[in-house]
Amino acid sequence: FLPMLAGLAASMVPKFVCLITKKC
């Protein structure tokens, strides 16, 4: 469960950073 959650977070964070900072 934790590895999957960590993988999901790792894939989601860059997307949020990209959207928020507008730096892709």
UniProtKB/Swiss-Prot annotation:
Cell location: Secreted
Signal peptide: none
Main location, first listed in the record: secreted
InterPro entries cross-referenced by the UniProt entry: Antimicrobial_frog_1
Key word Acyltransferase present: no
Keywords of the record: Amphibian defense peptide, Antibiotic, Antimicrobial, Disulfide bond, Secreted
GO cellular component: extracellular region
One GO-annotated biological process of the protein: defense response to bacterium
Pfam short name (any one): Antimicrobial_1
Role, per record: Antibacterial activity against Gram-positive bacterium S.aureus and Gram-negative bacterium E.coli.
Entry protein name: Brevinin-1Lb
Source organism: Rana luteiventris
